[in-house]
Amino acid sequence: MKKYAFPLAALLLAACNSGEEITTTQTDEPVARILEYTPAPGQFINELVSGGFTGTETTPEAAVAYAEKRMRKNTWVSLGGWGGYIVVGFDHSIDNSSSGYKGGYNFSITGNAFKGSSEPGIVYVMQDTNGNTLPDDEWYELKGSEFGKEETVQDYAVTYYRPTYSGADVQWKDNQGVKGKIDYLKQYHDQPSYYPAWIGTDSYTLYGPCLKSRTYDQSGNGSYWVNGEYDWGYADNFGNDRLSEDDNAAAGAMKVYFKISNAVDKNGQPANLKYIDFIRVQTGVNAKAGWLGENSTEVFGFTDENINQGK
C-alpha cells in the first residue's frame, strides 16, 4: 500500500486555524482530513447558529479549517446547492480490496439521510499518481444507480452570482439555458448572504453530473415535502448501501458505504484502480423543496472501512 505524508505547510495551517496540534507522522488513521471546501450557495453557508460559522471564514484556508473542525466533532458540513463539493485525503492509500467491509466496501461517507429525505452527493476518487500529495491528478466518478441513465445530465454546469445586497436570493444559470435561484429563507436562516464569503469573485461556475430530482410536494399545499431516495451509490442518500435496517427517523449520522471498484473513467469505462488517495463529494441534484430550501448534501465524515470494518 502506497503511503504519504501531507505537505507540512498545509498541516501547520490547519493546526493554526483549528487550535489543535497536528502531526506529520503517518498513522494510518481510518478517518480523513479536509483539503478543499467549495460549497454552492445555500441556507447553511455563512450561517452562525446551526451552520457553525464564526464570520471569520473569508479565505479558502479558513473554510477548510471550519469544515475540519466540524467533522472532528462528528458534526455535518453542508455542501450547499447543486455542484458544491468537499475534497478529503487520508494519511495512507485506501486499497481496492475485495476483503473490505461486508464484501468489498472500502470506505464510507457519513450523512444524515432518512426515509423521505435524501440529498444525494456524487462521489469521486483520485490516485496520487504524480506523488506530490495534492489532489491534482484525474478524478474518477464512482458510478451509482443513476449513472448512464438518459435522465442524468452528465456534463452539467451552473454559474452562481453574488447578490448585490444583503438578504437577497442567489441567482444562477446553468448550461442548459435554465435560470433559477437559491431562495433566501429569512425566517430560518437570516445571515446576510448565502454566497460563500471566501469566494472572491462575483460569480463562479461548478461542473459535474446532475441527477434527476426526486423532490415533490406530498401534501399538495406546500407543507410536506419529500426528497426521494436513489437505489445506491450516493452520499447522504437513503439507499441500500447504508447496510442497515435502521430508518434513521431521528436524522442522526449514518454511513453510506462505497466500493472503489465502481470507479469509471471519463468515457464511462471501469477505471480498475488499485488504490485511492483522495475523495470528493458533490451535491448531485439541482432542486428545492419549498420552505425547506435547496437540496444540499451534508457530510459528517469519511472512513477507511478496510481498516475500520464498519465500527
Which residues does each predicted region cover?
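Short beta-strand segments
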Residues: G121, E138-Y140
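C-terminal motif of bacterial Sec signal peptides marking the signal peptidase cleavage site
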Residues: L13-A15
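Positively charged n-region of N-terminal signal peptides that target proteins for export
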Residues: M1-Y4, N17
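A domain-level signal for the mature, folded cores of soluble proteins
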Residues: E20-E119, K143-K311
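Predominantly extracellular/luminal cell-surface or secreted proteins
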Residues: Y124-D128
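Acidic, glycine-anchored loop motifs typical of Ca2+
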Residues: K102, T129-E138, D241
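Sec-dependent signal peptide hydrophobic core
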Residues: A5-A9
